């Protein structure tokens, strides 16, 4: 029988990798607050932010950049970077003939001449002055790139050798078969965490956020 006191918490995120990362946190939430039922929303950032600001979701998994200038509380979980995904079958070298598969990190100089698989910016918005975004814009002026509408498409095309995918850590469905994941050197770390609305939050909202923060396991 369903409890008459059942209530809901609406949680939004932008990638399948984040949904997987929520698994241990939601298990703990069910143990600690069994009358709270999570409703999960997977949307692109633009729609997610609109839902958040209009009160249609209670909690978002976000980077701090994503919720800049909004009336919310941000609780950090970890600092994250973006990565280059390179298939084991991708046999091109850098312009100076370095083997991409022998590298432990990669720079935009190394990426010259390569097709990049990029996410639509509405999925991973950047603030003005973001070094990685500036490098991506410069790269696209002289090199071919392909815009993907979700992270799964980007990962798939990278695994099939169509190019090198550039993805933020929270979008990578790790581990990936036959694919190397290399940190990009030309960037700054971004703060990733949980946001909730200051004015609409309750004691339950804050307690749920603490449970999520303590148990969320990003890839």
Where are these regions (language model features)?
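Beta-alpha-beta core module
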Residues: 69-76, 80, 152-199
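Short beta-strand-to-loop elements that line the ligand-binding cleft
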Residues: 37-44, 140-150
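Beta->alpha turn/N-cap motifs
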Residues: 44-45, 61-66, 87-88, 150, ...
